[in-house]
């Protein structure tokens, strides 16, 4: 028998994989008050084909649920030998994931959120690729799934589609910098040794725990594999209490700003100037428009403080860094929003958003009223081409609301 005493953990893992040909996979599922969805989610995990793995362990961490989730988990664990349930006082999703990671014993590691589902055969391509390339992790595409009027609708964000248009093996983040935008943990399969050796952690008590951890992951990886297959179904629910539906909360904005700041610090310390440029120009601006809208929404919590924090972040992350927001790659209407924030023009921002809401960004063409402002960057003087291409005569001239 081979003597493994002098091998590292990673070496032992690779030796075992060579001997049996197929690795084992640990799936970590943090659960808190999702009784309506968790059984369907876990069924989609348990129904996965296992031809590429020699063993499956599903570690479900009940984070102090009070809605009946715990009873469902205990029943499923009694029915399925590969399911282990760990119960802990409510501590947040990051702590629950860490508990699951600590209990994992598989060669490979992946994650599932308890109100989402997996498509048929979610893991095979990623596991097969890792066996072939030796990369630290593999990442597949994710689709958002919404049910409207009883009809299921699937869609993929443009950047997700762009990132997964072609298979790319043994990538480094410097070679595929836009992958920094893939800030989700659940569409990836990791070598567990890679995760533990690099001490990857999810920040505690934040709505945006994945972005910092995944930035660490991309920077630490010697290589990763990008797959074209859809490996995760991200369920969009009308009643879902997700971070993306709570932008108007002050705490939400504070956590988003802190997450972006931590991400910038990580890339500045561990990446190239090119990677930093990509982060500022193409990645970090993507979701800012939601906060621009929230800043002038009537239900926004403490609107004066919200505006102050938002404007400070826009100035700090872009203008003070020498990358004006108008030089980013988001649509021009969003760049105009950012410019109005930077100029401290809340009333004008509210007027712009009211116009877009009234006519619809896909139906109306906006010629905004500040195009003669000498301070306005030239490419923001006419933004209608970025909003929608329409026929002649559809141009709308609009004057801002007067208070």
Locations of the language-model features?
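C-terminal subregions of glycosyltransferases and related glycan-biosynthesis enzymes
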Residues: 1-19, 236-403
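Nucleotide-sugar donor-binding/catalytic module of glycosyltransferases
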Residues: 1-256, 262, 384, 389-391, ...
């Amino acid at each position: 028998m081979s003597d493994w005493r002098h091998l590292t953990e990673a070496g032992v893992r690779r030796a075992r994989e060579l001997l049996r040909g197929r690795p084992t996979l640990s799936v970590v599922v943090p659960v808190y008050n999702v009784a309506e969805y968790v059984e369907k989610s876990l069924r989609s995990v348990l129904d996965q084909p296992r031809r590429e793995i020699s063993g499956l362990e599903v570690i479900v961490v009940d984070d102090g649920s009070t809605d009946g989730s715990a009873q469902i988990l205990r029943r499923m664990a009694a029915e399925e030998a590969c399911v282990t349930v760990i119960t802990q006082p409510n501590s947040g999703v990051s702590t629950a994931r860490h508990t699951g990671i600590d209990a994992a014993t598989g060669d490979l590691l992946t994650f599932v959120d308890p109100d989402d589902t997996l498509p048929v055969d979610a893991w095979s391509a990623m596991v097969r690729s890792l066996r072939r390339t030796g990369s630290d992790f593999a990442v597949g595409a994710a689709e958002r799934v919404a049910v409207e009027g009883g009809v299921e609708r699937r869609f993929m964000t443009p950047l997700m589609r762009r990132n997964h248009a072609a298979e790319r093996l043994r990538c480094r983040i410097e070679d595929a910098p836009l992958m920094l935008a893939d800030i989700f943990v659940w569409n990836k399969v990791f070598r567990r040794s890679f995760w533990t050796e690099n001490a990857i952690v999810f920040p505690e008590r934040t709505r945006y725990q994945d972005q910092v951890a995944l930035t660490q992951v991309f920077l630490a990886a010697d290589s990763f594999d990008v797959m074209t297959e859809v490996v995760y179904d991200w369920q969009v629910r009308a009643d879902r209490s997700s971070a993306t539906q709570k932008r108007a909360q002050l705490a939400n904005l504070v956590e988003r700003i802190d997450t972006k700041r931590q991400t910038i610090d990580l890339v500045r310390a561990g990446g190239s100037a090119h990677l930093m440029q990509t982060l500022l120009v193409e990645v970090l601006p993507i979701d800012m428009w939601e906060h621009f809208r929230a800043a002038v929404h009537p239900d926004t919590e403490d609107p004066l403080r919200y505006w102050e924090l938002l404007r400070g972040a826009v100035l700090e992350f872009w203008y003070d860094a020498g990358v004006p927001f108008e030089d980013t790659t988001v649509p021009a209407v969003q760049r105009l929003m950012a410019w109005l924030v930077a100029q401290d023009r809340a009333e004008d921002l509210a007027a712009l958003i009211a116009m877009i809401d009234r006519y619809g960004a896909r139906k109306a063409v906006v010629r905004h009223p500040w195009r003669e402002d000498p301070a306005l960057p030239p490419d923001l003087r006419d933004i209608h081409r970025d909003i929608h291409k329409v026929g002649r005569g559809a141009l709308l001239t609009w004057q801002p609301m007067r208070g």
